[in-house]
Design a protein with these regions (language model features):
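Short, intrinsically disordered/low-complexity patches at protein termini
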Residues: 120-121, 153
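AMP-forming adenylation/ATP pyrophosphatase catalytic core
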Residues: 2-3, 16-17, 66-70, 130-169
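The feature marks non-catalytic terminal segments
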Residues: 107-110, 122-133
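Core alpha/beta nucleotide-donor-binding catalytic domains of modification enzymes
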Residues: 1-115, 120
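Residue-level recognition of alpha-helical structural elements
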Residues: 9, 124-127, 142
Length: 169
């Protein structure tokens, strides 16, 4: 079984992939990067973050839309089951590249994935995605409250600084 890997090499590899894809988008004039994360990915993310003691932001899972510098990251398939996505990809004859680390139980995400498979997967995944949606709504509400407070109380100057009227909060 091997000892769990604590260096989070998967996160670093993911960050490197995102950087490469973002640079490709910028070089080719694309403003949006669409990713194929699906319903099971969202459930795994929620469980992984819960295991690590995350708060509301982490328990909201992956956002469907994330501003990331010059490129907006979109995840339009978060509510789609993996089996349906795979069937569509197969029907279209698209090539799939499988990351071998996706089956390596040294990684927390892989152990979580296997645990979901042993349970009533559909019910668990639906419940986890519902929880992520509720946390996402809480996160969005919080962000709106903060943005409105800043809009009312903060003056941004072209010189690159801002003043905050604390009494207006």
């Amino acid at each position: 079984r091997g000892a769990p890997i604590s260096s989070d090499i998967q996160a670093r590899a993911r960050d490197a992939r995102y950087e490469l894809m973002t640079q490709w988008c910028l070089a080719h004039g694309f403003l949006h990067l669409l990713l194929g994360h699906h319903r099971e990915d969202q459930a795994e993310t929620l469980l992984l973050r819960r295991e690590r003691g995350s708060g509301v932001y982490g328990l909201a899972g992956m956002p469907e839309i994330r501003e990331s510098g010059a490129v907006r990251i979109l995840r339009p398939l978060l509510s789609m089951p993996k089996a349906r996505l795979r069937a569509t990809v197969d029907a279209l004859g698209l090539d799939v590249i499988e990351d071998p680390s996706n089956d390596d139980i040294k990684f927390s995400r892989v152990r979580i994935r296997q645990g979901l498979k042993r349970k009533n997967q559909d019910a668990s995944i639906a419940q986890l995605n519902s929880e992520a949606a509720r946390m996402g709504a809480s996160r969005t509400t919080f962000e709106c409250v903060v943005a409105n407070a800043l809009a009312r109380t903060c003056v941004v100057y072209p010189e690159g600084y801002c003043l905050l009227n604390w009494r207006g909060l």
